[in-house]
A protein has these predicted regions:
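Glycine-rich beta-alpha loop segments
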Residues: 1-62
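Glycine-rich oxoanion-binding loops at beta->alpha junctions
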Residues: 64-100
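Thr-Gly-centered strand-to-loop micro-motif
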Residues: 41, 83, 102-104
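C-terminal binding/interaction regions
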Residues: 2-6, 11-15, 87-159
Length: 173
């Protein structure tokens, strides 16, 4: 990783509970305090809460939208990127990040975690999906965090240690 800005993609459910929304907002604030750029899907739920937190701490936010209208972005997005490709944009959210933080999550979040793991992009999980291999062993690829501060600190560490993006962006099965 170079001295350039670190981009942290945050993924999570679009209908977040108050508990998950609070965690997401704290994650956003920690991302801004760390000097990283927040990348998300730009809509509601975890995406909006994280963006709100980042903006409250003076951060920069990028929202990669599934539709074709900038107006659909939540009010805390600085740079709405319209795609018109629906939820296929989940790949773009993940690939834009040097690291992914999953906060809570539903099935869309599950797809984003899977894309990140396939692209060898580090994933930090905060109250999100857990994976068990067919042999019954717990998967160790998703790094677990117990707080927003720990999640962002771990994400920053993993991003700095990660291989350059050009070496990790081909999907591996």
């Amino acid at each position: 990783m170079t001295d350039k800005k670190i981009f942290i993609a945050v993924v999570g459910e679009s209908h977040a509970s108050p508990e998950i929304a609070k965690l997401a907002e704290e994650v956003g604030a920690e991302i801004a305090k760390a000097g990283a750029v927040l990348v998300c899907g730009g809509l509601k739920g975890v995406m909006e809460a994280t963006s709100k937190g980042a903006k409250s701490a003076g951060g920069t936010t990028i929202g990669i939208l599934p539709g074709s209208r900038r107006e659909d972005a939540n009010p805390y997005i600085d740079f709405p990127i319209i795609t018109g490709i629906g939820y296929a944009r989940n790949k773009l959210v993940v690939k834009t990040g040097h690291v992914v933080i999953a906060v809570g999550g539903s099935h869309g979040t599950l797809s984003e975690i899977a894309f990140a793991l396939g692209y060898k992009i580090p994933v930090v999980g905060l109250k999100t999906w857990q994976f068990i291999h067919h042999n019954g062993q717990m998967d160790q690829e998703v790094h677990r965090a117990s707080s927003p501060k720990e999640a962002v600190a771990l994400a920053m560490k993993l991003a700095r240690e990660a291989k350059p993006p050009e070496e990790t962006r081909e999907y591996k099965t």
